[in-house]
């Protein structure tokens, strides 16, 4: 549980003491920062501006919100403690064992906070249309709180990674909305994500506790319920690892904030950029 305690400390720093952590980062000379979105404030603003917008609240569009729902993308790029967890911790070896890969690259992370009563669901989506990778990616979801069925459990459509389909990227605000085709984002021939329900799909939600890791293929359709608990916070990190002969790919469906500045071109080995180091095997120079 040592790494759980380590991750818990640094996630709390990101969520509750970000300004102090950023000040320390600035002293060290780092420049790029993660992109943080307060989904609670975003949803509240949209609800007031667009009455009737089908925002993904657990108890419907008129749900009363009592807590924060926050997501930060690429937090480990500026937060050294998170980066140490993702690179030096047990996850790279776990990915190598599960996938049978002889090479694993760290790709990126997101960190999530769902406070009691925050209500906001994470709409069903795939990770693949967001990632600048050609080749398989394993996604590790790591909770630092006990996760029950009432405080934001992860849900997965079993077998959906074998559908051989890539769907349009979700806007993460409404259940079936997609990122708009603007600022260079192009959906091409990607299909619209279907409405996901337990009646129509093999949908399973997982309870979890600190020390557990849920690993999914990047093409797996997944989402998370809203936190309707009155007492239980749900914090977690999602850590992404490319494996095998995965290479950089300038994916046109990838919107901000998932378009990292790297200097790479499609086909380059990921480790050509310091952003995507080889993290397994350990003797790769990391």
Give the role of each language-model region:
Residues 132-149, 207-210, 215, 240-243:
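Short, conserved beta-strand element in jelly-roll/cupin
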Residues 1-3, 111-114, 129, 147, ...:
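Short, solvent-exposed loop/turn segments at secondary-structure junctions
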Residues 9, 78, 107-108, 136, ...:
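Residues that flank catalytic or metal-binding motifs in active/ligand-binding sites
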Residues 149-221:
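Double-stranded beta-helix
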Residues 101-104, 126-133, 142-153, 159-162, ...:
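Active-site region of the double-stranded beta-helix
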Residues 124-127, 141-142, 200-202, 221-224:
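Glycine-rich, charged/polar anion/phosphate-binding loops
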Residues 2-123, 130-131:
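Non-heme Fe(II)-dependent double-stranded beta-helix
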Residues 20-21, 25, 45, 166-175, ...:
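Non-heme Fe(II)/2-oxoglutarate
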